[in-house]
């Protein structure tokens, strides 16, 4: 098939409670483990956002939905399969302490698979919290994977299915298909692919627009001990939501980095050039919008190591949205805390309280400088780059962790 079909064209999130099998399902669909961080391997949970690309295929000799596969050759007919499309999976951590990471990943998602373990009551805390996050951020294209059906009998699976249906009633996932699957045994993977093809279409994007890249990760790919002359520039990982990128293009990153001058500190944009591009696991000369992308730059790798540039927005100089050190937002609070056993009521936001805010892929802490009915003003510890009208996930400190309490809409600056 033509190479252009192999570049990922849509981002699909895997969300849900910890240990319900999100990462295992990504492996069944892509052949890749997204848990590569040493602490993740040791603890058996996702800590950072994980990424993997998968080329979805169909056998021309099989009927639907059995025709769908990720194999290049149909095991039943021994015929070459045809490429449908390549997708990028964003594997979000399900642990309650990593909600900010999940929210930053949700900004990249065009659709999502809500993974629900068939061997536990529904909903588990982060099942509920992640579904609410999808609703807040505006992700409507959802598939529900009822995973681990190999661990329960038919009656238990049926009861779990009914619990899922009752749980999603009245939510953004009310009409989402529920697909029984065993990611570990790779059972019903064809049904999952069929649901992805039906429910999560590739969005219409504008390749003629200015490039706009949301950064979710950044890396120093140089090995320790590399000679100065052999050092490569820092790498940014994220999603191109508009426009096209080519090697040699100039990029501006906002909010940039903090610099100190004359005893004062301020945030200044960073400019660089595109040295290399990687999409779908391959080096490419140009990248179209959609899917996940690695951008090799001319930046000093010390600026990009350890996800230091996660949350940045990149595009041609002068084309980016404003950078905000404070802003006003309209606020829509949830009625109760999701994921809490007691369903605690949510109090109004008050002046002086700290909030954790996720805007795009950026997460920052803001101090409320003014609070009124349905709106508030916040001063940010770390500025963000975002257009007016951007959606903001609002988290409040409750006990020992940040809890999702509502959604904001950015209106204007101080």
UniProtKB/Swiss-Prot annotation:
It comes from the Archaea. One of its GO terms (cellular component) is cytosol. Coiled coil: none annotated. One of its GO terms (biological process) is formation of translation preinitiation complex. Mg(2+) 1 binds at residues 23, 46. Its cofactor is Mg(2+). GTP binds at residues 19-24, 147-150, 182-184. It catalyses: GTP + H2O = GDP + phosphate + H(+). Pfam families: eIF2_C, GTP_EFTU. Keywords: GTP-binding, Hydrolase, Initiation factor, Magnesium, Metal-binding, Nucleotide-binding, Protein biosynthesis. Residues 7-204 form the tr-type G domain. It is an enzyme of class 3 (hydrolase). Its EC number is 3.6.5.3. Residues 182-184 are annotated as: G5. Heterotrimer composed of an alpha, a beta and a gamma chain. eIF-2 functions in the early steps of protein synthesis by forming a ternary complex with GTP and initiator tRNA. This is Translation initiation factor 2 subunit gamma. It comes from Halobacterium salinarum (strain ATCC 29341 / DSM 671 / R1).
